[in-house]
């Protein structure tokens, strides 16, 4: 059985750790609120640009845009969005596990990684990484998404990739994050929804389509980054909450052991005193 000194040392150490996990939980909760607001705000915009793109594609008379043309698949681009840091439960592990399984289906996969965790994992295993992006910060900017989307489109148009998949974590709530795979390129023009009135395109549907297609890719990347960031904060908040609760349970168990050890020591001392007194009387 551990000594009382060891028990006190362990209790103190766990209490210090508990303070850290509690603080990290509070920080993650504050960041999650902001990230969640950005996710909610981005979804209607992504839906609207998809609707306008569908109507422009239906009205165009021009030959297919390069981002719409399907070609023989010789190399597959795989964009994986993970976190730069850990301590967020199974967030990174779930995404990496999904990517590991899906990459086996491609004969010549080439990765673009967003976040250190995914980059480090696949670099150690010898996968070809043609682009990496880290340190995007806690608040994802559209400029950052534009840079990443521009790099993806550049590699697609120059023939490095013949198709591109985007893997990210969809935010459902702080307890639930779902890894998702989205085929990003070549784009498939969304089906036009009925209703909503007629659209008049200026200067033409072709010009609008040519402008919207790259913007659509940027919006999809931006939404994926926002969803993943909110998922990361939600997973970290949940993980730190669980760690704090586990620390509370461990402190309670160790305190009980300490009290029992203290009681045993007191009982032993009393027995020795009584025994000594009895020996003197004899």
Curated annotation (Swiss-Prot):
One Pfam family of this chain: ATP-synt
Protein name: ATP synthase gamma chain
Protein family membership: Belongs to the ATPase gamma chain family.
Species the sequence originates in: Carboxydothermus hydrogenoformans (strain ATCC BAA-161 / DSM 6008 / Z-2901)
Membrane topology qualifier: Peripheral membrane protein
Main location: membrane
Keyword DNA repair: no
Protein's cellular compartments: Cell membrane
Summary of subunit composition and partner proteins: F-type ATPases have 2 components, CF(1) - the catalytic core - and CF(0) - the membrane proton channel. CF(1) has five subunits: alpha(3), beta(3), gamma(1), delta(1), epsilon(1). CF(0) has three main subunits: a, b and c.
Function statement: Produces ATP from ADP in the presence of a proton gradient across the membrane. The gamma chain is believed to be important in regulating ATPase activity and the flow of protons through the CF(0) complex.
Protein keywords: ATP synthesis, Cell membrane, CF(1), Hydrogen ion transport, Ion transport, Membrane, Transport
GO molecular function, one term: proton-transporting ATP synthase activity, rotational mechanism
GO cellular component: plasma membrane; proton-transporting ATP synthase complex
Record HAMAP family: ATP_synth_gamma_bact
GO biological process: proton motive force-driven plasma membrane ATP synthesis
PROSITE patterns per UniProt: ATPASE_GAMMA (PS00153)
Name of the gene this protein is made from: atpG
